[in-house]
Amino acid sequence: MKTRKIGLANYLAYGAGDFLGAGTTALTAAWLLYFYTTFCGLTPIEATLIFAAARVLDAVVSPLMGFLTDNFGTTWLGKRFGRRKFFILLGIPCVFSYSAMWVGEMGFWYYLATYLLFDMVYTMILVPYETLVPEMTDDFKQKTKFSGARISMAQMSAILASFLPGILLSWLGKDNASSFFYASLVFSVLCAVMLTLVWCFTWERPREAWSEAALRAEAEKQNLTLDQSLNRLVIELSSTLRIKIFRQHLGMYLGGYIAQDVFNAVFTYYVVFVLMQEAAVASNLLGTMAIFQFIAVIAMIPLCIRFGPAPSYRMVVVLFGLSSLSYALLYYAGLSDVYSLLLLISAVAGLGRGGINYVPWNTYTYIADVDEAITGQRREGIFAGIMTLTRKASQAGAVMLVGIIMQLSGFVSGQKIQPEGVSHTILLILSVGTLVVLACGFLVSLRFKLNLHTHSVLRSETLRMRELGYAQSEQTSAEHRAVVELLAGMPYDCLWGNNNIGYLNRHKPAAPALIKGGALNSTYTRG
């Protein structure tokens, strides 16, 4: 595929778009439950009802958005502004809805409405945004650089999200809800600016670079009725979970991110109600983590290229798991008032969290390449929709669970001194809860085999299939065939649409089970 020249401005502008994804998520995950229960008069159960309602909405909106952005290219607006970039342009003024969530002393229905509104805006922007890298390049190293730029900018936004509330609380007073409103307003302005840069410095895959199968699918879409379109949506969404490497990717992604969501949801409570410190201290510790997350992301770029995503992922999971356990050990050892130790543990946690943030979004950009080899189509939007749905569902689910457990443990909203059982519950969630989820991601990563070498083989074989219009195992080496089969999870001759994965291929016979062959070179199979 011919691509435009990619320079530093393109990497940085694309990465800046995740100020919306990571910055607002960091602020929401670390502070929203605390804001609702401290400044808005909501009980933990009421707050979790808001998150639950948003997830019901997400179950429809996120996959629908992925489907829409994949198919928007046939419309006048899609042809004029791009099937992906139109929604980014539309979202620029809409990001200011984020600030409406952070107005204090309003009622339950106000907070429900504002949360749902921003949730839809977030989805409308993030789903097409996440598809842009595979639209712009097929190259593994360029994709890695795009991912590195994205996560680096994301960590910069997380640093701001961590420190800003504490600074504003110090200026405006620790009991002033306006601190959070002004913090959200800063993020709204920044997100609008960053999305403008994304619009100006990114592009979509030219139509002449589409495969024959993709063009055929595009033509078929224009003749579908509403019922047929909905049926197609269901088939396309469910087909993503039939791709083995995507299931493995989701396992690593959710293992790392849900662990962070659990940790984030309870960390401010840990500082305020277990350590008996001001919320500004929590802000400083979260800021320390965010700084080291940024450092970790920079280090992960060469590590993932050198050792592969899965081994790098396991290393940072161990770092974050040990630091989570250390917070509880400090308390029970009577050392929790030693601020230097808290800073040290937070720094180690930041190194682990930064790596966990980087690896899944780095590997995500290659999943559509595996899918193209299987289906003969480019379906980035569908995968982005599923990713956004699982991300937001995991965040809200973690916060919901924490809120319910806190309520059951005897937590009282607005009360500065909590029952002793609440402290032990907070410590249990912070350490054991985080470790259990991390362990799930660690185990899944043992089976993940996508790396620089296997992707290079996949890419060369995909180019061959594009030229031929079908998969022919006789024209490839035994080792290359084994690598592609390992990633795709089906026999080579069943690739490039010769299976029933996806709507376009739904009437074809299913691919037979893959028979394991001889051992591959360890360079290809390490994971």
Feature roles, as predicted:
Residues 1-524:
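Membrane-embedded alpha-helical bundles of multi-pass transporters/translocases
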